[in-house]
Amino acid sequence: MGLFTTRQLLGYTEQKVKFRALFLELFFRRTVNFHTEEVMLDKITGKTPVAAYVSPIVEGKVLRHRGGETRVLRPGYVKPKHEFNYQQAVERLPGEDPAQLNDPAYRRLRIITDNLKQEEQAIVQVEEMQAVNAVLYGKYTMEGDQFDTVEVDFGRSEGNNIEQADGKKWSEQDRDTFDPTHDIDLYCDQASGLVNIAIMDGTVWRLLNGFKLFREKLDTRRGSNSQLETAVKDLGAVVSFKGYYGDLAIVVAKTSYVAEDGTEKRYLPEGTLVLGNTAAEGIRCYGAIQDAQALSEGVVASSRYPKHWLTVGDPAREFTMTQSAPLMVLPDPDEFVVVQVK
């Protein structure tokens, strides 16, 4: 038995709960929802058919010889869930004024909405992790409820992942005389299209900004474009636009996620430089919602299905859960070049 309608819950999560994720906002702006559990990769671009190489992962090892190319892929199903209990509504909430205590009914609503926020954030974290790894490596590991873990590989060319060798390491160069422009141009040439943005972690930024000739060419007066401003909105504390290096927008990212062990980790490994284009055609694909209640309500092809219900018993129990079947697709992984800067 649910106390809130699906329309109310969807309206709340769509309008009130917005977790912006950098790579999703920049490179995966299009969304395609499917009425089937499987995502049809060859139907999402309208151009060249997209295929992915899918390999099983057993005990942490990718068994590529047991994999194969496919154009039909079933996403992992994620459904973060919370239980609300009566004791939570009786106790004072964090930040609540002891002199003006709220009634339990208000606390209950606040806790339920907070639970929905946490569920949305958990799903966005899964989506952003897929997006980041697709950009960094051209592939990612897909997991889900009652789902065999697999590696989804979109076929990145080896030359698009570069590691600076001895003699070429930026950390070995003279800060007053070295000009990184030639290196950056060579890296950009590996991309299948034009490059207009460089995303890096703080380590790479400190190295680059340490070069006198880089600082002289960096244009900090020209404002960022509207697309970039939208992507970094609400991310000001962890994403910084530094300026333009020629036509290249320079962005420093310190975005992070919460790992399974509860620790906070950065999406970008230390020393990572990502070169790409904000016109990249990454696609957020979603398989059908696999819930009988959703089907009865006509909610099948959707990126989210939040629900709230009570179970009758002694005592009764109350739950929230948000379901999704995300699959981030990068049709052309060679649009990006990733450099391990040393």
Q: Model features per residue range: what roles?
A:
Residues 1-40, 329-342:
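N-terminal alpha-helical "arm" segments
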Residues 25-26, 182-185, 306:
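Short alpha-helical segments and helix-capping/turn motifs at coil-helix boundaries
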Residues 60, 145, 262-263:
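Intrinsic-disorder/low-complexity loop/linker signature
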Residues 78-156, 179-183, 187-204, 316-323:
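Long, contiguous amphipathic alpha-helices that act as assembly "spine/axial" helices in icosahedral shell
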Residues 161-177, 182-183:
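Glycine- and small hydrophobic-enriched segments that form the cores of compact globular domains
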